[in-house]
Design a protein with these regions (language model features):
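Hydrophobic/aromatic-rich transmembrane helices and adjacent perimembrane loops
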Residues: 124, 129, 221-227, 258-261, ...
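Hydrophobic, aromatic-rich transmembrane alpha-helices
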Residues: 3, 19, 177-189, 359-398
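Membrane-embedded, lumen/periplasm-facing catalytic core of multi-pass transferases
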Residues: 124, 468-582
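Membrane-interface alpha helices of multi-pass inner-membrane proteins
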Residues: 50, 247-263, 269-274, 305, ...
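Transmembrane-helix signature of polytopic, membrane-embedded enzymes
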Residues: 33-34, 167-168, 184-209, 225-226, ...
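Extracytoplasmic catalytic/substrate-binding loops of multi-pass membrane glycan-assembly enzymes
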Residues: 113-127, 133-156, 163-168, 317-325, ...
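Membrane-embedded, hydrophobic transmembrane alpha-helices
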Residues: 1-90, 630
C-alpha cells in the first residue's frame, strides 16, 4: 500500500483509489483499487463476449478484448488531471501497522485451509468455471448450480484463483477492505485529526461480525462495498467537484458495477441515486449547473450496461431478467409465480419489518444465514439510533446528515428485501462512521465546556457510555471473527471445522456461555497441519491437479451429471468438468424449479437426449435418503440405481470429501 500524506485535513474524494479534486493531496490506496476496478470491469466486459466460446483461441481473444475495454474504462474513471503536486511519495508505516497488518494477519489465520463454503460448493464455483469460458449455461446444461445470479463476481474470484491459487484468491476481500478503509479515512478526517486515532477508528469500523466471518472465504459480499462507499463520497462532494459531468459518470458507473457484482446492493443504490438527484437539484439551483446531454447518456450507460447483458440473457432463457426472483411480476413458466425469500431469516411479517432495524439485534440467528449459533453486538441498530439523533441535533455537518439519511432509507429497504445482515455491510460501515462522529462530538463537548457547566457532566457521561459501548462492540465483533467457524463435510454433514485455527478451541466455551449450541467438533490435530496446507499456496490453481489416477478412474464413465441435492455441483465440476450438469434439485427450501410442468418437460427432453449415456449424481453420504425422497416429489422420469462410495480431494491431497456416486437410471417410456 502506497500512500501520500495529507498536507491538510480537507475532505477529498477517491475514485479508483486516487486522490482527486484537492490541491492538498490525500492519503489513499493508489494501485490496489485500480487493480480491483480493472478486474471488475474486465470480467463484466467478458460477459459481452460470451459468444466467443468453444476453444482456447476464442477464449483468449475474448479475454484480450475484455482486458482492452477494462483498461480503457479504468483509465477514464481514474483521475488523469489531479492538480495536486506533492513533494514526493512515501509509505505510510502507521497505516500499514494499524490497518493493513491486522487485516492480513486475520486473513492468514485461516488462509492455508481451502474454504469449502456451502454457497461456493452449491453454485459459485460451477458458475465461475463456465462463465470464465463462455455462456454460464453450456449446451446440455440446465442451471448446473441450481441458482444463477450474475456470475461477474464469481468470474472475478475465478481470475484471482488462476492468478494466485484457490487459497489466496480471497485476498480480494482484504483488498476491498483496504480500499474501503482508505475511503472511510477521508470521511473521518474532518472530525478525527490525529492520524493514529483515525486509522484505529478505520480498523474498528471495518471489524464487524459479517465482514470478519467471510474475509477468509471465496464469498463475493465485499466486492461492491468500496464502490458504494466511493459513490457516497463522490455524491457528497459533487458541489465541489472540479469536473461535475465526469464525476457524475463515475458515480453512475460505480453504482452500475455494484449492481452487477451483487443484486442485493439495489437497496443501497436506490437511496444513493435519490441523494444524487437531490444534490443535482441543489447544484442546479445554486450554481446553475446542468449536465450535458451526452454526459447524461454516458452516465446512464455506466449505470445500465454492467448488468444489461446478463439480465437480457436471463430474460431470453426464462422470461424473467431476475430469475428466479420477483416471478410474481415476470411470470416465467419455469417456476411458480411467487417472490421467493429465505423463510427462516429476516422479518416474518410486514409489521416486524417496520421495526426490524431495531429489534433484529434481539434475534441474531435470524440475522445470519445457515446457523443457529451466532451472536451480534448491534452495530447496525446503534447506527440507526444515532442517525435519528444526529438529524435532530443542531449544527450537524451536512455530510453527516446525508450519511444518516442514506443509512435510514437503505436500512428499511434492506429490512423489506431480506433483513439478513450479510447483505447490509454498507449500512454497517455507515453506522460505524456515525458512531465515530458521535464519539468525537461528545468528546469535544466534554473537553471544551467550563468545569461547572451542567452540559459538561452530561457529555462526560455520554463519552463514557459510548466508549464502553463501542469497546464492547469491537471486542465482540473481533472475538466473533476469531472463533467463528464454517462446517466441513468430509465424511458426514458438519463433521468438523472447515478452516480450523487455534482460536476455535474457544468457540464451544464461548457459545456455551451464551447458551448456544455448536454443531462441529474442533480438531487440534487438523489445525496443526497449517504449514502442510500452506505448502499448497500458489500451487492450487487447478482442482484437477490434485486428482490421482485412481481418483480419475472413479469418474471415467460419467457422461452427464444430474444435480439432485444442494451443495454438490462444485464436486461434479471437479470430478468430471466436461460433463454437462442438469439440475433437478430444490434450492434449499426457498424455490423448486421442478414444480413447473414446463421445467419438467424441458428436463425430461434433455435427459432423453442423453439416453444410452452414463448419468450419475454425487451426494454427501448423509444426504442420500433425502435426495432419494426428493426425487419422488414430482415425476421426473428417472430413479437412483447403483451406489458407489468415492472420495474426492478438493484443492488438497489431505482434504478429501467422502461422497456417494449414484447412477441415474432413466425410466422406460
Amino acid at each position: 500500500m502506497t500512500h501520500r500524506e495529507p498536507e491538510s485535513e480537507a475532505y477529498s474524494t477517491s475514485v479508483s483509489g486516487r486522490a482527486e479534486a484537492n490541491s492538498s493531496g490525500s492519503r489513499s490506496a493508489y494501485s490496489l483499487s485500480d487493480v480491483l476496478l480493472l478486474l471488475y470491469v474486465t470480467c463484466i466486459a467478458r460477459e459481452y463476449f460470451w459468444l466467443l466460446n468453444g476453444g482456447w483461441t476464442k477464449n483468449a481473444i475474448a479475454w484480450s478484448l475484455s482486458s482492452v475495454i477494462g483498461v480503457a474504462i479504468v483509465y477514464f474513471l481514474a483521475d488523469r488531471c489531479d492538480d495536486s503536486k506533492p513533494d514526493g511519495w512515501k509509505i505510510d508505516w502507521l497505516w500499514l501497522a494499524i490497518v493493513v497488518l491486522p487485516l492480513l494477519s486475520f486473513f492468514l489465520l485461516r488462509a492455508p485451509f481451502p474454504s469449502l463454503e456451502f454457497d461456493n460448493l452449491n453454485y459459485h464455483f460451477v458458475n465461475a468455471e463456465r462463465a470464465l469460458r463462455g455462456w454460464p449455461i453450456r449446451a446440455g446444461d440446465f442451471f448446473p448450480g441450481t441458482l444463477l445470479p450474475n456470475p461477474a463476481p464469481d468470474m472475478v474470484l475465478g481470475v484471482a484463483r488462476y492468478l494466485l491459487g484457490y487459497r489466496l484468491a480471497p485476498l480480494l476481500n482484504v483488498g476491498c477492505l483496504l480500499w474501503t478503509g482508505a475511503l472511510i479515512d477521508q470521511f473521518l478526517r474532518t472530525f478525527v485529526r490525529t492520524r493514529a486515532l483515525r486509522y484505529l477508528a478505520v480498523l474498528v469500523i471495518l471489524s464487524t461480525e459479517p465482514i470478519l466471518a467471510i474475509v477468509n472465504t471465496p464469498m463475493i459480499d465485499l466486492f461492491a462495498l468500496p464502490l458504494l462507499v466511493s459513490s457516497l463520497l463522490l455524491i457528497i462532494k459533487l458541489p465541489e467537484a472540479r469536473n461535475r459531468d465526469r464525476t457524475l459518470i463515475k458515480i453512475a458507473s460505480f453504482l452500475g458495477i455494484s449492481l452487477a457484482l451483487k443484486l442485493t446492493t439495489v437497496v443501497f443504490i436506490v437511496p444513493l441515486i435519490a441523494l444524487l438527484l437531490y444534490q443535482l437539484r441543489v447544484i442546479s439551483m445554486r450554481l446553475k449547473y446542468y449536465p450535458a446531454r451526452s454526459n447524461l447518456l454516458l452516465a446512464a450507460a455506466g449505470l445500465i450496461l454492467p448488468s444489461a447483458l446478463f439480465f437480457g440473457y436471463m430474460y431470453h432463457l426464462t422470461g424473467n431478467p431476475f430469475f428466479p426472483f420477483y416471478n410474481n411480476i415476470f411470470h416465467s413458466p419455469l417456476i411458480a409465480a411467487a417472490n421467493f425469500k429465505e423463510i427462516t431469516m429476516g422479518p416474518r411479517s410486514v409489521l416486524e419489518t417496520l421495526y426490524w432495524p431495531f429489534s433484529s439485534v434481539l434475534d441474531p440467528n435470524r440475522l445470519f444465514i445457515s446457523t443457529n449459533d451466532s451472536w451480534y453486538a448491534g452495530r447496525l441498530q446503534l447506527g440507526v439510533v444515532l442517525a435519528i439523533a444526529v438529524l435532530l441535533m443542531k449544527n450537524t455537518p451536512v455530510a453527516i446528515k446525508q450519511i444518516s439519511i442514506t443509512l435510514l432509507f437503505s436500512t428499511w429497504l434492506w429490512a423489506f428485501s431480506s433483513g439478513i445482515i450479510r447483505y447490509a455491510n454498507f449500512a454497517e460501515i455507515l453506522s460505524g462512521i456515525l458512531c465515530v462522529y458521535m464519539f468525537s462530538y461528545a468528546y469535544r463537548k466534554a473537553t471544551s465546556l467550563a468545569p461547572w457547566h451542567i452540559e459538561k457532566l452530561k457529555t462526560q457521561v455520554a463519552v463514557v457510555l459510548l466508549t464502553l459501548l463501542l469497546t464492547f462492540q469491537f471486542s465482540a465483533s473481533l472475538w466473533y471473527g476469531l472463533t467463528y467457524y464454517y462446517c466441513s463435510n468430509g465424511t458426514h454433514l458438519c463433521d468438523g471445522i472447515m478452516q480450523p485455527q487455534p482460536f476455535n478451541r474457544y468457540t464451544r466455551p464461548t457459545l456455551q456461555a451464551l447458551n448456544l449450541p455448536m454443531k462441529a467438533v474442533y480438531d487440534p490435530n487438523k489445525a496443526a497441519t497449517y504449514f502442510q496446507e500452506a505448502a499448497f499456496m500458489f500451487r492450487d490453481r487447478n482442482a484437477q491437479a490434485f486428482l490421482t489416477t485412481k481418483d480419475r478412474e472413479q469418474f471415467q464413465d460419467v457422461k452427464v451429471w444430474i444435480n439432485t441435492y444442494d451443495g454438490t455441483s462444485a464436486f461434479m465440476a471437479i470430478a468430471a468438468p466436461d460433463a454437462p450438469i442438469i439440475s433437478v434439485a430444490k434450492f434449499l427450501d426457498i424455490f423448486d424449479y421442478m414444480t413447473s410442468p414446463e421445467t419438467r418437460r424441458i428436463v425430461r427432453g434433455m435427459i432423453n437426449d442423453h439416453r444410452g449415456e452414463k448419468m450419475y449424481t454425487l451426494l454427501l453420504i448423509d444426504h442420500f435418503e433425502q435426495a432419494r425422497l426428493a426425487l419422488n416429489r414430482v415425476p421426473m422420469g428417472f430413479h437412483f440405481g447403483k451406489v458407489q462410495n468415492v472420495s474426492l480431494p478438493v484443492f488438497s491431497a489431505a482434504n478429501r470429501t467422502d461422497l456417494l456416486l449414484v447412477e441415474i437410471v432413466v425410466d422406460e417410456r
